[in-house]
Amino acid sequence: IYNNDFFPIDWPRVVLHFNHGGLVHTKGFKKVMKKRKPTMFVTHWDVCLSSESCFKVLTRRGLSIHFTIDNDGTIRQHLDINHIASHAGSKVNAKSIGVEVSSAYYTRYQNWYVKNGFGERPVIEGAKVHGSTLKPFLGFYPVQEEALKALMKAVHECTEIPLKTPLDKSGETSYNVSRTAAAAR
C-alpha cells in the first residue's frame, strides 16, 4: 500500500497489516498525509528468529519498519510506505522504505529452524567485513532472497526508486549510507 493505494507485488505470500495475521505499527513512525517520494530502499538483517519476533522487538524499542520478510518468504507490510518508518536514522528515514529480512544470524539457532520446519539455513563462511573475517553465520533462505527481489521490483514500479546498488567514491559497493549521500537524495 502506497498513499492508501494498493500496488501489486508479484509474489504468492503477501500479508498486509489489516489482513488476518497482519501486524501494524501504532507508534514509532511519522504519519504523512501528502504523498512523499522515497528515494532509497534500506534492507536490514533482523537477527531474530521470525518476522513476528522482529516486529515485537521493534515495537518495544519504539521503532518501525515498512516490510518484513519471514523464513518462508512471506512478505508482510506493516505500514503504508507513504508513512515514515523509524528504522535507519532520522536523515535516512524520511527518504527510505525499510525492510527487515528474518535470520537469527548465529549458527547456534540452526536447530531451531530445522525443528520448526523451515529446514537448514545456508551457513556463510569466510565473509569479510572491514578486513576482518567473520565467524560462520546463518544466511538467508533462497525463498527470502526471491521475495526481496519481488518486493524491490514492486516498490520500484510504484515509487520509481532506482534499482541500483549504492557505490562509494571509489566505485565499490557501499553498505552504509553516508550523511552526504543521505542529504543528496
What are the residue ranges of the model-derived segments?
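Active-site-adjacent loop/helix surface patches within enzyme catalytic domains
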Residues: 2-162
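Surface-exposed patches in mature extracellular/periplasmic domains of secreted proteins
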Residues: 158-178, 182-185
